Regions:
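Active-site-proximal segments of metal-dependent phosphoesterases and phosphodiesterases across multiple
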Residues: 112-128, 149-162
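Residues at alpha-helix caps and immediate loop-helix transition turns in enzyme cores, especially N-
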Residues: 18, 46-47, 68, 120-124, ...
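Metal-dependent phosphoester-hydrolase catalytic domains
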Residues: 133-140, 148-258
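Structured beta-strand-rich core segments of catalytic domains in phosphoester-bond hydrolases
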Residues: 15, 27, 33-113, 228-230
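Glycine-rich, phosphate-binding/catalytic loops in enzymes
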Residues: 20-22, 50-53, 88-89, 125-127, ...
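Active-site beta-strand/loop signature of hydrolases that rely on acidic residues for catalysis
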Residues: 2-8, 22-44, 72, 108-111, ...
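Active-site environment of divalent metal-dependent phosphoester hydrolases
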Residues: 11-13, 41-44, 66, 116-119, ...
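Glycine-rich, highly charged phosphate/nucleotide-binding loops
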Residues: 13-25
Length: 258
């Protein structure tokens, strides 16, 4: 199964210029299921629902905002929930979907944690993690834009390396990009590349490239074989002078066995 996450950068001044690139990247990566962040209602209806070649898809808009989260899937989505509509889950900017493949039940959660508050990120990931540990599924997938790098408090909490507000992730989660990079003897490549991405061209940015976009799997006794993890959306198109987004997408190929 190919699973992917992609923040498509809802920047009004360049979005229509990049629209074809975004759709082409999504079609080319050909994931079985992909979570998208920074999706406007207009872009979802105009491009994703009609041009991305997915029969099953869903969009959930944040209350009072013009953007939200989307999931595109080769499999029927049998249950959907917006956690930002649930006060008991910290109104977390996350959407949860269930789907079945060959009798195996999957829970997939797509998140876009707040960029402007580490405290809010911590409270939201605690709520999301608690929600997912309350579910019954054969495999849990957590993906999205975490707005924090590897080694951040959110990442360390998910990986079982620290507590947050007296709570722990048990069982913990595994970051697929880190696992695959370790096997290959390589460093994990940044997904928010403030050095090479044209968004920051000529700006002499003070920001350091970070691995903000990640895919985690919850620890399970069931068998998981990680085949590959790659970035996509990294190429600059001459016509626009941009890559498709200011974030690079992450795609993982995983074999699941119950």
């Amino acid at each position: 199964m190919k699973i992917a996450t992609y923040n498509i950068w809802n920047d009004e001044s360049t979005l229509e210029l990049r629209a074809k690139q975004i759709v082409e990247e999504i079609r080319a990566v050909d994931a079985d299921i992909i979570g998208l962040q920074e999706v406007s209602a207009e872009f979802y209806n105009k491009h994703l629902a009609t041009e991305a070649s997915y029969v099953h898809h869903a969009f959930m808009q944040y209350p009072g905002e013009e953007e939200g989260l989307a999931v595109l899937s080769r499999y029927p989505l049998i249950f959907l929930e917006a956690l930002y509509q649930r006060e008991n889950y910290a109104n977390s900017t996350a959407m949860n979907a269930f789907f079945m493949v060959d009798g195996i039940r999957f829970s997939l959660t797509n998140v876009h944690l707040p960029w402007d508050s580490v405290g809010a990120r911590e409270h939201q990931i605690l709520a999301v993690d608690r929600h997912l540990h309350e579910q019954k599924a054969d495999f849990h997938i957590l993906m999205g834009d975490f707005n924090g790098d590897i080694g951040s408090s959110v990442d360390r909490y998910l990986c079982g390396e620290q507590t947050l507000h007296g709570c722990e992730a048990n069982p913990p989660w595994n970051d697929l990009a880190r696992a695959y990079a370790a096997r290959c003897g390589e460093a994990v490549k940044p997904t928010l590349d403030t050095v090479h991405n044209p968004r920051w061209a000529g700006k002499k940015s003070i920001y350091v490239p970070e691995v903000m976009d990640r895919i985690y799997l919850m620890d399970h006794w069931n068998e998981i074989a990680l085949e590959s993890v790659n970035l996509f959306g990294t190429e600059i198109t001459k016509k626009t002078g941009y890559v498709a987004s200011d974030h690079y997408g992450v795609v993982a190929e995983v074999n699941f066995r119950k």
